[in-house]
Amino acid sequence: MSLAHTAAEYMLSDALLPDRRGSRLKGLRLELPLDKMVKFVTVGFPLLLMSLAFAQEFSSGSPISCFSPSNFSVRQAVFVDSSCWDSLAHYKQDEAGQYTVKSLWPHKALPYSLLALAVAMYLPVLLWQYAAVPALSSDLLFIISELDKSYNRSIRLVQHMLKIRQKSSDPHVFWDELEKARKERYFEFPLLERYLACKQRSHWLVATYLLRNALLLLFTSATYLYLGHFHLDVFFQEEFSCSIKTGLLHEETHVPELITCRLTSLSVFQIVSVSSVAIYTVLVPVIIYNLTRLCRWDKRLLSIYEMLPAFDLLSRKMLGCPINDLNVILLFLRANISELISFSWLSVLCVLKDTTTQKHNIDTVVDFMTLLAGLEPSKPKHLTQHTYDEHP
């Protein structure tokens, strides 16, 4: 019998989790994987396109090429290119002989508009970083620590029960004390459960998360409006008529009224416009999916931790509307599942609990580890019958 008890003690000692208090803060993920992907794309993609636009401008020189008159010198031709790029306006003569002016400034503003887009898309990230991350990190550290500690306390409790059973000469006394302790809820540690229930009444994290994604949708909509209103109007215009008869050149008769110019960077402009629409169109469903995850609970994660004493948010139906801070915390617990050492142990115990023939006697990890340690989780039937015979 002593050998069996020694084996049980070793098994329970191995089931205890190591203390990793010092290194946990560095390993915490304070952004969900999809949010991180959205951040890299929404901020990094405009910067990539901006680099492409600047690289094309530096490699090919002037972004326009004007067809100056043949009697113009090289310096005059360079002046025409520079003047037409500065004005970047298309002059078109209508039926009445009047000139209408159409600005082509989106071509000139392309790299800077991409930079402004990247800065705007980074604002929701800054909002989350400074408004939510400090509170979220402290919540996660406390909850992860308490979940693992609750698991360890359960194992230590089984170790203590095993020692009491070894020292007790009368099994009736041991089981009577055990039943009394169960009825008086000595085995439960309700601090964590109450803290999580309190988080259901808090809405700071969920409001910040909703605002972050709402801003992303707003800036994406503004990008669509900008591209549709300004880029689409000049999307196919490769050539334009430029007028340089301004200032001192206004009275010069040898200077033509209009000079035809060609946009050499039109292909880059079109690539940037089309790729921006395509990328942000793909990202919109991802952002909406991130928002819809707040409308349902991660019940699988909760059901596994139901094996801890006093962690019965599901069984007691304490979960209400999922749009609160607790649901956000559960999403980040799932993202930081590698930091929850107790999760793998409890997952295994849940599988074993579902397959055991005595599952009607097993509710918590204390019950199951008691069974694995060689003790029955409830008073044996022969002892119950013996007690009934003594006290009919």
Curated annotation (Swiss-Prot):
Keywords: Cell junction, Cell membrane, Endoplasmic reticulum, Gap junction, Glycoprotein, Ion channel, Ion transport, Membrane, Transmembrane, Transmembrane helix, Transport. Residues 1-39, 135-215, 289-392 are cytoplasmic. The chain crosses the membrane at residues 40-60, 114-134, 216-236, 268-288. It is a multi-pass membrane protein. Residues 61-113, 237-267 are extracellular. Skin. Pfam families: Innexin. It catalyses: Ca(2+)(in) = Ca(2+)(out); ATP(in) = ATP(out). GO terms for cellular component: endoplasmic reticulum membrane; gap junction; plasma membrane. Glycans are attached at residue 71. The keyword rRNA-binding does not apply. GO terms for molecular function: calcium channel activity; gap junction hemi-channel activity; structural molecule activity; wide pore channel activity. The keyword Transport applies. It comes from the Eukaryota. GO terms for biological process: cell-cell signaling; monoatomic cation transport; osteoblast differentiation; positive regulation of interleukin-1 production. Belongs to the pannexin family. Regulator of osteoblast differentiation by functionning as a Ca(2+) channel in the endoplasmic reticulum which regulates calmodulin (CaM) pathways. Allows ATP release into the extracellular space and activation or purinergic receptors. This is Pannexin-3. The lineage of its organism: Eukaryota, Metazoa, Chordata, Craniata, Vertebrata.
